[in-house]
Amino acid sequence: MDRAEKKECVESLSEVFKSTSVVVVAHYSGLTVAQMQNLRKQMRAAGAAVQVAKNRLVKIALEGSEVASIADLMRGPTLIAYSADPVAAAKAAVAFAKDNDKLVILGGAMGKTALNADAVKSLATMPSLDELRAKLVGLIQAPATKLAQLVNAPAGKLARVISAYAEKDAA
């Protein structure tokens, strides 16, 4: 890798650290190429991405960023997983690590907050942004639905009473 490629890599990583809300760092030693491809595929499906880069270049890219606290984790064969959704990268990484013990989650960062491995696992159990939005919409719609049911209930009861009288008279 020549100097220009290294500079381009650092700029790319800096842009990633500026645009993402969560970064997860993990050791990937012992993963086969097929397993790494599977990890990347699962990350893409979750709306996250995985990148492997030289630790020194990652540390340079981290300087001055909000997630600079993860620089200490960059030792050995590490990968970074990141996403715009605050929980997508953590969920995908933890799910893959459950099935494959060779992926060891070291920690990460969410904004300026540094996360240890347990915090990343806790983050993975939280609902995603889309799930929270769906719950919020459901909560907002619930009173309107109940109001509509209450308004329609008396008319329905009246119709059933009239129907019962009609059946009684017919018999």
From Swiss-Prot:
UniProt keyword annotation of Transferase present: no
Record carries keyword rRNA processing: no
GO cellular component, one term: large ribosomal subunit
Pfam families (alphabetical): Ribosomal_L10
GO biological process: translation
CDD domains xref list: Ribosomal_L10
Stored InterPro entries: Ribosomal_uL10 (IPR001790), Ribosomal_uL10-like_sf (IPR043141), Ribosomal_uL10_bac (IPR022973), Ribosomal_uL10_bac_type (IPR047865), Ribosomal_uL10_CS_bac (IPR002363)
One function term, GO molecular function aspect: large ribosomal subunit rRNA binding
Annotated keywords: Ribonucleoprotein, Ribosomal protein, RNA-binding, rRNA-binding
Functional note: Forms part of the ribosomal stalk, playing a central role in the interaction of the ribosome with GTP-bound translation factors.
Family: Belongs to the universal ribosomal protein uL10 family.
Subunit structure: Part of the ribosomal stalk of the 50S ribosomal subunit. The N-terminus interacts with L11 and the large rRNA to form the base of the stalk. The C-terminus forms an elongated spine to which L12 dimers bind in a sequential fashion forming a multimeric L10(L12)X complex.
NCBIfam families according to UniProt: PRK00099.1-1
Protein's recorded name: Large ribosomal subunit protein uL10
